[in-house]
Amino acid sequence: MIPDVSQALAWLEKHPQALKGIQRGLERETLRVNADGTLATTGHPEALGSALTHKWITTDFAEALLEFITPVDGDIEHMLTFMRDLHRYTARNMGDERMWPLSMPCYIAEGQDIELAQYGTSNTGRFKTLYREGLKNRYGALMQTISGVHYNFSLPMAFWQAKCGDISGADAKEKISAGYFRVIRNYYRFGWVIPYLFGASPAICSSFLQGKPTSLPFEKTECGMYYLPYATSLRLSDLGYTNKSQSNLGITFNDLYEYVAGLKQAIKTPSEEYAKIGIEKDGKRLQINSNVLQIENELYAPIRPKRVTRSGESPSDALLRGGIEYIEVRSLDINPFSPIGVDEQQVRFLDLFMVWCALADAPEMSSSELACTRVNWNRVILEGRKPGLTLGIGCETAQFPLPQVGKDLFRDLKRVAQTLDSINGGEAYQKVCDELVACFDNPDLTFSARILRSMIDTGIGGTGKAFAEAYRNLLREEPLEILREEDFVAEREASVRRQQEMEAADTEPFAVWLEKHA
């Protein structure tokens, strides 16, 4: 089932320096909660400055949904320590609140008023809040309080030059973009390995179903927790943050221009369903527009091609201008066993897997094959640890045992690990392979199995509160290592100043400005 990458691995072993200079970055979302686990109703902590313009700490959907962002980094340890400093400073500056350590929220009642993230009075800030108003009206606020970790990854120019020859200008844009689309197609075919190993949301609180019937064969505990005994990541299931209306958009990942055209079409395509919501009611705007996507960021995807945008530029226009610059992996649940929601083992695994995806052949995928890959993902998401589980390739009927496919994949990853270790020194990547491959013979070692044992004992709420309390105490006590207190104070003041400058620079009323941007 795994493509034959022996030739590509042999090539890599002859060109190990092609992997020197991998760049990566992390984003971690987490809900601010009270000591009893309920959602914090306070505004964004003052010490964290402006969520609109802060370089490292912002908010996602809700005012209580923090998002931590590391700069691009070539050093894994440095990146994780930077992320930990962001958590340490925040833990010391959020009063008696804690950071929820799980992807799925718990103590949120059906119909509870969840305050949307606020970004001030600039047109840009008001637009961001209106976008969130649209998300709330389309999918419900509860779905938007699910948290995850995003891992951003780019291969060094040395890799592309070794692979594609001496490339520059438009040629480089085309060939590098084609290379990243290969990564994306392989990710759709084999990325289910990520929720298998690291999925950590096998259960939900009963409030999450909002009284709606479900066809999933949930088991229920006395405390009202619903779980699937072999599930890995309900966050990635249809119960989590997915957009069913997007499933027939036909966006593909074969070619830069084809992909961008599909994306641009989606933000222009009217939706009958969202038209029913209306655009405005009693003088209050309800969504940016009633199209399938309000803006490009609304496209739900487990992985995205990205380029840093310039001021006023849309993500797709940035891609057209310069091609794909990096890949954003979006399938990681919060790691409940780490105070910062992600750990070194996961980052090293993702490095290995992304390199493998760049090496393995990846035939072009039609939108129908893309839909077929979802079958494998759903199996792993809902019953990934089930004995005897099999997976297919695309739309073909042949089935293969998941543990065997996983072990075959790790045989390749071990060779990538040897190459990365040879240029970085030590055996850190090989050690990760040895630790994780054991999960295929013993699913009890996976994150989902480990966290489910705790949840069955103490419920999602009890588990979440215990971890949150322990991590709060730990992070508040730890000294900063990379950033200093004065760095945070300076960024707080600078971010507030940047927001004020944006607000002062606006000349158009929001309604007029919105007509040009909706």
Swiss-Prot record:
Catalyses which reaction(s): L-cysteine + L-glutamate + ATP = gamma-L-glutamyl-L-cysteine + ADP + phosphate + H(+)
HAMAP family documented for this protein: Glu_cys_ligase
Family: Belongs to the glutamate--cysteine ligase type 1 family. Type 1 subfamily.
Protein's organism: Escherichia fergusonii (strain ATCC 35469 / DSM 13698 / CCUG 18766 / IAM 14443 / JCM 21226 / LMG 7866 / NBRC 102419 / NCTC 12128 / CDC 0568-73)
EC class: ligase
MF term (GO), any: metal ion binding
Gene3D superfamilies linked: 3.30.590.20
Gene Ontology cellular-component terms listed: cytosol
Name of the protein described by the UniProt record: Glutamate--cysteine ligase
Keywords: ATP-binding, Glutathione biosynthesis, Ligase, Nucleotide-binding
InterPro entries recorded: Gln_synth/guanido_kin_cat_dom, Glu_cys_ligase, Glut_cys_ligase
Pfam families: Glu_cys_ligase (PF04262)
Pathway terms, separated by semicolons: Sulfur metabolism; glutathione biosynthesis; glutathione from L-cysteine and L-glutamate: step 1/2
Superkingdom of this protein's organism: Bacteria
EC number from the UniProt entry: 6.3.2.2
GO BP terms, alphabetized: glutathione biosynthetic process
